[in-house]
């Protein structure tokens, strides 16, 4: 009887201990520093690391090379952004302005576009930010020009960057309106007829911060702004107001903001772990924080990216570990 009682008491402890799973270089990950996490419609997890692109099928990793002719591109200037477009295609873009598309049939990444080298001889990294909008365009941004690559026609349009600032992130509001975060602040803009036009917005125009990440919720029309050592701010388009939550996270840098569900956001930080915020009340609480005294607890607080899958598992790019997975279903 005592034996069975001991096992019953031990069982819940065992379940809690299995909350976290770790994936590192010893498991096949190419590098401990992971920048982006994506999941395709087949179910594979994709990781953009310091060394290249890894695919994980739940058991093992496969590494992919980025080739420009006979030359492998493995420098940090070519490993910067990993996105999945609205049609489910995987794209990798680098600061040198080279765009790769994943070819599922041949299981390779194909170089489909690169900025003309002769136009940027003095700039080793001409692109400060790249992003995919809802209109089938990949944005290649620098301080003077925005190059729009049409993923369907493969045509490239040049748009003057009227901000004259380094762009760090973009969120699309509707077909032609955008929030654009830069090194200097945040702007409301319209892209129409291949012209980017700034739109006046008193509240946003007076916010002088270095924007790291943006998240826009179209249902409640709120923009969540993650800054470098300035915490999180919320711009409400309905009331035209800016709010900073009581737990402002000003002592850490915000790396990523992702929706956990319809009412809550996850806020990843560089040094403070992950926080959870209510989108209505802005109540912010620690959610996933390192516990170095626990054998099977969270094992790091420097989070570059997060991904919440359909099974409610949270995949974290957790330096210097690699990938940490939290599974609350255990």
Where are each of the predicted segments found?
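Carboxylate-rich, polar loop motifs that coordinate divalent cations or form catalytic acidic clusters
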Residues: 1-330
């Amino acid at each position: 009887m005592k034996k069975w009682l001991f096992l019953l008491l031990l069982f819940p402890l065992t379940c809690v201990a299995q909350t976290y799973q770790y994936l590192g270089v010893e498991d096949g990950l190419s590098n401990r520093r992971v920048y982006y996490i994506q999941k395709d419609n087949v179910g594979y997890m994709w990781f953009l690391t310091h060394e290249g692109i890894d695919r994980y099928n739940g058991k093992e990793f496969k590494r992919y090379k980025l080739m420009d002719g006979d030359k492998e591109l493995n420098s940090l200037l070519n490993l910067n952004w990993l996105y999945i477009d609205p049609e489910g295609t995987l794209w990798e873009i680098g600061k040198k302005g080279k765009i790769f598309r994943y070819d599922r049939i041949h299981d390779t990444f194909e170089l489909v576009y690169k900025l003309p080298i002769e136009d940027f001889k003095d700039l080793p990294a001409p692109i400060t930010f790249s992003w995919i909008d809802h209109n089938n365009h990949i944005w290649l941004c620098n301080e003077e020009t925005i190059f729009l690559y049409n993923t369907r026609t493969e045509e490239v349009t040049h748009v003057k960057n009227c901000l004259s600032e380094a762009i760090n992130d973009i969120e699309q509001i509707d077909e032609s309106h955008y929030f654009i975060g830069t090194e200097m602040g945040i702007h409301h803009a319209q892209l129409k007829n291949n012209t980017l036009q700034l739109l006046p917005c008193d509240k946003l125009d007076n916010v002088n911060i270095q924007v790291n990440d943006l998240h826009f919720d179209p249902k409640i029309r709120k923009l969540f702004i993650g800054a470098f050592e300035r915490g999180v701010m919320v711009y409400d388009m309905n009331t035209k107001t800016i709010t900073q939550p009581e737990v402002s996270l000003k002592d850490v840098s915000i790396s990523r903001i992702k929706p956990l569900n319809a009412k809550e956001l996850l806020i990843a930080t560089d040094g403070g772990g992950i926080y959870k915020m209510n989108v209505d009340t802005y109540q912010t609480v620690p959610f996933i924080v390192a516990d170095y005294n626990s054998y099977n607890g969270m094992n790091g607080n420097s989070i570059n990216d997060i991904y919440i899958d359909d099974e409610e598992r949270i995949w974290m790019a957790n330096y210097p570990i690699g990938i940490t997975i939290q599974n609350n279903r255990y």
